């Protein structure tokens, strides 16, 4: 029998609101809000690490693209 553990994704895709013109537009604020929302929806640490790694693997546009794959991103 395998002891393989699977990553736990959130129960549903959370929704977060980001004001790109304000301090919310800071990349680290976006990552923090996203991780908090994912965690609150039931994601485990491995899933959060996967998101962070992908989100930080490129430029700001990549961050927004990856983040929108994990959460419903409402941009102001």
What are these regions (language model features)?
Residues 2-76:
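Long, contiguous binding/interaction regions
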């Amino acid at each position: 029998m395998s002891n393989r553990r699977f990553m736990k994704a959130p129960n549903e895709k959370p929704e977060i609101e980001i004001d790109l013109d304000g301090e919310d537009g800071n990349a680290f604020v976006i990552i923090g809000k996203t991780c908090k929302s994912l965690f609150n929806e039931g994601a485990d640490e491995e899933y959060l690490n996967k998101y962070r790694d992908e989100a930080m693997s490129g430029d700001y546009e990549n961050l927004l693209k990856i983040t929108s794959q994990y959460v419903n991103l409402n941009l102001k």
